[in-house]
Amino acid sequence: MARRVFFSFKYKQDVSRAMVVRNSWVTQGKEAAGFIDAADFEELKRQGDTAIENWIDKQLEGTSVTVVLVGEKTCTSRWVKYEIEKSEETGKGLLGIDVSKIEDLQGNTSDRCGKIPKGYEFYLWNKDKGYQNMGDWIEKAAKDAGR
C-alpha cells in the first residue's frame, strides 16, 4: 500500500541528509511531506510560531507515518518535538532513522543526539540499508499504529 509520509528533521543541520532519504522514497514512487525550500522556511519563521505550527499541521494532514530523521541537533529542536507530539495525538505511525552518517554537501558526517522518538523503532540509515528497507520500516510503523 502506498503511504504518504511526513519527514521530521532539524532543517539547518540535516536538510542535505534528509534530501537523500526523501529522494530515495520518492524515486520509488512514494509521496513525501514536510519539505520546504530554505527561502520559504525563512519567510515562514518571520511570520511567527503560529504560522509554523499551521504549516506543520497542514503538512501532517493525509499522512499515516512520521519519520524522524535524527542528526546531531534533532533532539533539541522544538519543531521536531512539536511534530512528534502532533503525530502521537493523531495516531500516526512513528519511527526514527539515524541520518548522522550520511555525508552532507561538504562530505561531512556528524554525531547523533540520541534515539528519538522514544518508544518507537529506530534504525541506522547506512548500517540497516535504509534505501532498500525504509518501505518495510514505514509499513511496520503504520501497522503498529493501526493504520
Which sequence ranges carry the predicted segments?
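Generic recognition of short, well-ordered alpha-helical segments
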Residues: S16-V20, R78-Y82, N108
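Anion (oxyanion) recognition and catalysis
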Residues: E88
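Residues at the C-termini of beta-strands that transition into short coil/loop
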Residues: G34-A39, D98-S100, N126
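Conserved beta-strand-loop-alpha-helix hinge of the TIR/SEFIR fold
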Residues: Q59-E85, G96-E103
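Conserved N-terminal substructure of TIR/SEFIR domains
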Residues: M1-G62, A142-R147
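C-terminal interaction surface of TIR/SEFIR-family domains
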Residues: R4-F6, V20, G48, E103-R147
